[in-house]
């Protein structure tokens, strides 16, 4: 949930688009998320009649990228539970209630990577600990590098990628109304991250 996943973009870039020694050495270091161009979107089936969508915002996070040993790179990302937006205030209020998150100001969703496996020139699997609603579970993200290189305006290393995973609400004690409202939640992530100054 990384820009949860920028490490994938960097790792992928190191094996593909950023393959030269000079470029990969320049790519090593700490990166931060571009919150203005990063989204986590989720969707679930509602009684078989429709698909409901929502998203989270307010990302904070840091990626430490090791160009010589990409598997040793790390990702730490967080986002406020109460940043959830679904387009209907009453639904958001219900999700924040004790029926689901029981959310209070300051509650966060966090992701900390535990392993990165490069699977192709522009694909990777990122495994990490996802903590949500006082429950921590291991999840794996399927990530694809969109682009890696110098940002034309910022003039420093930048990368963007998409990632997907599927979560079970019940794994995080959020399973009310399942299976009528699907337990499975599809998660779609689109991220940009920039090298820290």
Give the predicted meaning of each segment.
Residues 1-20:
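Gram-negative bacterial Sec-dependent N-terminal signal peptides
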